[in-house]
């Protein structure tokens, strides 16, 4: 395990980077809201035609909701429903808004949009700074392996907003907003994250076939099971239980991932492809031994922009002696570990190595002149293969030169150790500055002050209600952090769904469309930005695998767990009814997106580049357009119009 100081430093830098990307996230959400508002006029034009198309044979659909648990209606309810040819909005399940519908149409809905965006930001802060650290402490106390922890607690931490949105959709709104959010988030994670990483990574990244195929195959099985269960527009108790059991099987697969991977390599003869699926690795003496320095020390063949500092390329050309923690980090980014673990370990390793290279006295202007201390037996010439000259060292230097460089290196190491100690002291002094903002300590700088003022209400509330278990004096209170952060995630998710429901009702947009577009983007954009940061450092393989692997939790637990609680615990023997028949088409597109993505990666020779990125973003646009038009009854009748005031 890496030192606690390295873990804290990596987490703080990741959280600060995600806060810096807040503006781009809000702009993206605003553009999605504008698109939905422009498309709402299409629904208003078709409402009159739909009223004529609704016949007597469709009156049984009137007033259906997601949580209708039986088909028995009283005569009074039947008469009330038969008199309506519209769907009751989920807005009535929430407290009354202070603005009327007319006020919102005149411009007050902008306040609800801003409030929803603020809830997106609040969820990201609570999950990153409080909820996930508390889950890490729980995993440490339970002595869980990295595989099981990544597939259970860490997956719950990254998908907490989607899970709570689904719970609210089942037990409160009794609509399709939860299902739409998870379906839209799943497509966003597959197509949009891969597309953004391919366009803006600044390089061509090779992808590992094992991780992509493993997660894609099981994810495909999950989506197929979901399609089969919702095809008849209702979900029974045993169907929801099957979804939960499938996730338990996924945990077992991750537990024995290394053994399964070895069998896969033996069958495909792909042994030796350890990092990013690279097939053209340099040969190394004594390859039978497991050497942690092999990982990420082979130079990749990719194109990059000059503005991107490639840490792994510098390490390939100028390796150094690894400490125990550094060797552990490099082992844990191999394909023997789950995507969640690999993504986390890669982020920590990249930050540590880049900081080391920047702080090195010999590292100037992007060119490293660090002397490499390598035994003569394993001398490498030009970094490509074993040297044929017995009296030559690294890059053609003689043994005498190596001895002299070794003496100089010893002196440099002593100086570097002193510099590292000073750097550690500086990092300890900056501990309070990084991480979540504190309400009583405004930062310096105009931009930071604006961010601090923007987040002050959130920081004030969290400062007094959620202990920060990252700090040593609050570390023992990690269970309190877990409980309080869970409550805040539930509260923020409730506010988020409430605001989005009001926005959809005001613009005449169904709840399922708001879930597929606005809620899905709001809960997934932070993960997209984090994956982009990792992909720009050459770790696109882990970003892609993480985006697909996290969807397994969303489908099997995000939907299966709330359904199982309702049909087994709350009302045993009941079933879940789906309000929108268009969801089956959206889930079908979700399944198609998996096949198209894997097939596109295969045709692109398992490389992530701009061409693949553009294709994925185009497919995501097609999915949004098709889903929106389907829910608006453009192709066929799937939804009754929403009831007015």
UniProtKB/Swiss-Prot annotation:
Source taxon at top rank: Eukaryota
Broad class of the protein's primary localization: membrane
Membrane topology: Multi-pass membrane protein
Annotated glycan sites: 70, 85
Reported tissue expression: Abundant in the brain. Highest levels found in selected thalamic nuclei, hippocampal CA1 neurons and in layer IV of the cerebral cortex. Expressed in dental tissues.
Substrates-to-products reaction catalysed: Ca(2+)(out) + K(+)(out) + 4 Na(+)(in) = Ca(2+)(in) + K(+)(in) + 4 Na(+)(out)
Alphabetic keyword roster: Antiport, Calcium, Calcium transport, Cell membrane, Glycoprotein, Ion transport, Membrane, Phosphoprotein, Potassium, Potassium transport, Repeat, Signal, Sodium, Sodium transport, Symport, Transmembrane, Transmembrane helix, Transport
Acidic residues bias: start-end ranges: 404-435
Region: Disordered, residue numbers: 379-398, 404-442
Record topological domains on the Cytoplasmic side: 128-151, 203-209, 256-486, 534-551, 604-617
CC terms in the record's Gene Ontology section: cell periphery; plasma membrane
Signal peptide positions (record): 1-43
Gene Ontology annotations of biological process type: bone mineralization; intracellular calcium ion homeostasis; negative regulation of gene expression; positive regulation of gene expression
Record's subcellular location: Cell membrane
Repeat region (Alpha-), residues: 148-188, 520-551
Modified residues (Phosphoserine): 307
Spans within the Extracellular topological domain: 44-106, 173-181, 231-234, 508-512, 573-582, 639-645
MF annotations from Gene Ontology: calcium, potassium:sodium antiporter activity; symporter activity
TM ranges: 107-127, 152-172, 182-202, 210-230, 235-255, 487-507, 513-533, 552-572, 583-603, 618-638
Entry's family note: Belongs to the Ca(2+):cation antiporter (CaCA) (TC 2.A.19) family. SLC24A subfamily.
Function in brief: Calcium, potassium:sodium antiporter that transports 1 Ca(2+) and 1 K(+) in exchange for 4 Na(+).
Listed name of the protein: Sodium/potassium/calcium exchanger 3
